[in-house]
C-alpha cells in the first residue's frame, strides 16, 4: 500500500478525468472513459517498477507479484472520486451500529472490533476494502491538516483547476465544475466539500483509530474558517492578474483571446488567497 500511495498520481497531467473524457483525449480513448487518470498512473507506475534498477519486486515469486499487483491496482483505482460512495458504503457495512454512537466506549483502538486484518476468517475482499478506504482517505487528507497547510493545498488545487478551465474555454469545451476562475466561489465550495466528503470519510477512520480524532477537529475548524469567509461574501484574494484583465474586458472575443493566451503561455503563478 505504501508503494501504491507513493505512485498513485505519477505523471499526473493536471487535467481531470472529466476533461479527458470531454476532450476525447488519448488517455480517455486508451482507458475507455473509465478512471482514465487512475489507470494511467497504474500503467506508468508498473512500467517504471519493471525497469532494470527500479524493480523492487524482482525477487518475488510470480504468485506473490500477482497478489501485490492486484492489491495496488485496487488501491490506486480507489483514489477516483467517482467511487467515493462505494468505498464509504463498504466501510460503513463493517462498522457495528453501536460504534457510530457518540457515547460508545472509549477504547484506545477499535480497529479490532471491526475486522482484524491478521484474522484468517477475514476475507481478502474485506481486507482489501479497508486498504482501499485508507488510501482513499489519505488522498483527501489535506483538509484534515491545520488551516495554513490546508489553505496552501487549496491554492495549488485551484490554480490547477483554473488552468484546466482556461484550456476548456480555449477548446470550446464545457468548463468543468470548480474550473472557472471567473465564477468559482472557493469558500462556498470548500464548505460543501469538507462537510459533504471529508468529515463523513474521516468519521469512520476515527471510529477505528480514536487517536486520529485531531483530523476531524482540524476538518471542522477548516470548515468553520471557510464558512466565515463565505458568510462575509469573500471571494477576494482569488483574482490573479488574468482574471482582473478579463473582468475589465467587455468583449467576449477579447475574453476568449485572454483565456487562450493564458493557456498557451502555461501561466503557472500560484493563486494566493488573502484572508486577512
Predicted region positions:
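Divalent metal-dependent phosphate-bond-processing catalytic cores, especially two-metal-ion Mg2+/Mn2+ enzymes
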Residues: 3-276
Amino acid at each position: 500500500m505504501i508503494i501504491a500511495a507513493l505512485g498513485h498520481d505519477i505523471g499526473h497531467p493536471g487535467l481531470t478525468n472529466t476533461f479527458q473524457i470531454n476532450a476525447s483525449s488519448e488517455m480517455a480513448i486508451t482507458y475507455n472513459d473509465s478512471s482514465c487518470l487512475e489507470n494511467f498512473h497504474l500503467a506508468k507506475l508498473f512500467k517504471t517498477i519493471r525497469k532494470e534498477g527500479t524493480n523492487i519486486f524482482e525477487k518475488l515469486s510470480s504468485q506473490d507479484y500477482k497478489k501485490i499487483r492486484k492489491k495496488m491496482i485496487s488501491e490506486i483505482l480507489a483514489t477516483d472520486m467517482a467511487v467515493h460512495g462505494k468505498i464509504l458504503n463498504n466501510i460503513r457495512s463493517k462498522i457495528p451500529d453501536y460504534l457510530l454512537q457518540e457515547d460508545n466506549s472509549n477504547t484506545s483502538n477499535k480497529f479490532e472490533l471491526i475486522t482484524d486484518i491478521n484474522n484468517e476468517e477475514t476475507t481478502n475482499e474485506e481486507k482489501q476494502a479497508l486498504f482501499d478506504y485508507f488510501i482513499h482517505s489519505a488522498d483527501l487528507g489535506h483538509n484534515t491538516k491545520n488551516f495554513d497547510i490546508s489553505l496552501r493545498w487549496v491554492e495549488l488545487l485551484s490554480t490547477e483547476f483554473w488552468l484546466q478551465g482556461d484550456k476548456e474555454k480555449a477548446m470550446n469545451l464545457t468548463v468543468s465544475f470548480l474550473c472557472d476562475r471567473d465564477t468559482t466561489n472557493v469558500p462556498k465550495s470548500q464548505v460543501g466539500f469538507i462537510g459533504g466528503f471529508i468529515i463523513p470519510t474521516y468519521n469512520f477512520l476515527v471510529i477505528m483509530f480514536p487517536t486520529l480524532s485531531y483530523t476531524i477537529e482540524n476538518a471542522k475548524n477548516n470548515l468553520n474558517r471557510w464558512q466565515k469567509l463565505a458568510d462575509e461574501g469573500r471571494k477576494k484574494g482569488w483574482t490573479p492578474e488574468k482574471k482582473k484583465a478579463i473582468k475589465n474586458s467587455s468583449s467576449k472575443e477579447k475574453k476568449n483571446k485572454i483565456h487562450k493566451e493564458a493557456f498557451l503561455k502555461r501561466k503557472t503563478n500560484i493563486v494566493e488567497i488573502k484572508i486577512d
